[in-house]
Amino acid sequence: MARADLDGRSIKPLTICMIGAGGFIGSHLCEKLMAETPHKVLALDVYSDKIRHLLEPESLAWAGRIQFHRINIKHDSRLEGLIKMADLTINLAAICTPADYNTRPLDTIYSNFIDALPVVKYCSENNKRLIHFSTCEVYGKTIGSFLPKDSPLRQDPAYYVLKEDASPCIFGPIEKQRWSYACAKQLIERLIYAEGAENGLEFTIVRPFNWIGPRMDFIPGIDGPSEGVPRVLACFSNALLRREQLKLVDGGQSQRTFIYIKDAIEAVLLMIENPERANGHIFNVGNPNNEVTVRQLAEMMTQIYSKVSGEAALDVPTIDVSSKEFYGEGYDDSDKRIPDMTIINRQLGWDPKTSLWDLLEATLTYQHRTYAEAIKKAMSRPVASS
Ligand SMILES: NC(=O)c1ccc[n+]([C@@H]2O[C@H](COP(=O)([O-])OP(=O)(O)OC[C@H]3O[C@@H](n4cnc5c(N)ncnc54)[C@H](O)[C@@H]3O)[C@@H](O)[C@H]2O)c1
Ligand SMILES: O=C(O)[C@H]1O[C@H](OP(=O)(O)OP(=O)(O)OC[C@H]2O[C@@H](n3ccc(=O)[nH]c3=O)[C@H](O)[C@@H]2O)[C@H](O)[C@@H](O)[C@@H]1O
């Protein structure tokens, strides 16, 4: 049966240039596009491990519809040609782990702003549609966080719900280099918006709110550097797999809404296949029903991992650490992130489905199956003597 868009028109097969296709979100998007659509993907990245199962063997049902190009977009003259060959470019490439923002601020700013510039330019000059991945971090802190602790207004959604077309972007001072990422993302959003306004670029900007699931980041010492600090899902998974305490930064009081990657990818597919409804828009993509403090997240993950692995949890499963100890000088944090869903709901009729419990159970089952043996082996190896 021919695929139809939300307005009943049949969808023509597209060629998509996906930059950063080998990452967490890219791997899920490629999987969905191969399994459920006729679209072709030119997959650009410096790594391909997370999409290897889609590239080999050549007998796969979608062979010929996905092509990997090992390209660093910082310096590769093939970029423009690949964008020209495609109907649509999706840019996911970025440094996007908070441990880097204050320790490698230059790399962070270059990656999120400077390196994205040619992509925007080539799309604009060649009249190609662009879906660019920004972040919910562009909202920074909530207005409510500046009110007195006991102010009743803190409970009023007007002071914390984050709306694409109304909320301000509130970052800390320059010396808090945590905001280097958010600020670079904000500027590239403004540039894309301006290309749309002045030069007619067809664009959609996505602001993900803590998408999580299998293949997110890496487990230090197993499929990433031992000293590396991934995002919270992988940090907590790593501690659970090693039977270590989960570290709560500054007491784990910050709040987040987590969304299952598979729900979020449905929203991206709707954007891809409904350009008339998605062009010119900025979309929050999150799950406002899945809010927890980081401490609650740690408690839930501990309980679920115990169920999944059959191992009893530690007597004291968490430990408090200061942000300076954990991330170093210049760290700062978003206090609360509730996405307003009005625009995506109106334009694309999309809503998230999966509860936090269910998504953590699916994800931790994957983590256990994928890493438990490798961790056991690594931990039983004698430490090399100097
Ligand atoms: N996962 C989330 O919840 C989340 C939240 C907010 C924003 N985002 C944004 O979504 C995008 C994708 O995030 P992700 O979670 O998949 O991250 P990821 O780190 O898993 O994926 C990014 C990919 O981009 C590639 N890349 C980076 N620089 C490159 C370069 N110069 N040339 C070629 N490839 C390059 C990396 O190798 C990596 O595979 C990023 O822009 C990120 O800022 C993600
Ligand atoms: O995912 C998003 O929507 C955006 O937010 C993330 O930022 P953040 O949520 O702060 O990063 P996480 O590593 O997921 O941390 C969440 C919270 O857990 C805390 N944390 C993290 C790791 C840990 O071991 N312990 C711990 O308490 C952090 O301090 C933070 O308050 C990242 O910046 C991006 O991937 C993305 O743009």
For the regions a protein language model found, what residue spans apply to each?
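N-terminal Rossmann-like NAD(P)+-binding domain of SDR-like oxidoreductases, especially those catalyzing
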Residues: 1-211, 367, 386
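Amphipathic alpha-helical recognition patches that constitute DNA-binding helices
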Residues: 20, 24, 179, 207, ...
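Residues in well-ordered alpha-helical elements
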Residues: 22, 77-80, 99, 106, ...
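A short acidic, helix-capping loop that chelates divalent metal ions and anchors anionic groups
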Residues: 98-102, 214-222, 326-329
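Short, solvent-exposed loop/helix junctions and linker helices
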Residues: 19, 110-113, 181-182, 226-230, ...
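NAD(P)-dependent short-chain dehydrogenase/reductase
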Residues: 144-161, 190-256, 261-272, 298-305
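C-terminal substrate-binding subdomain of Rossmann-fold SDR/epimerase-dehydratase oxidoreductases
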Residues: 71, 210, 240-386
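Gly/Ser/Thr-rich beta-alpha loop segments that engage phosphate groups in nucleotides
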Residues: 22-25, 142, 215, 253-254, ...
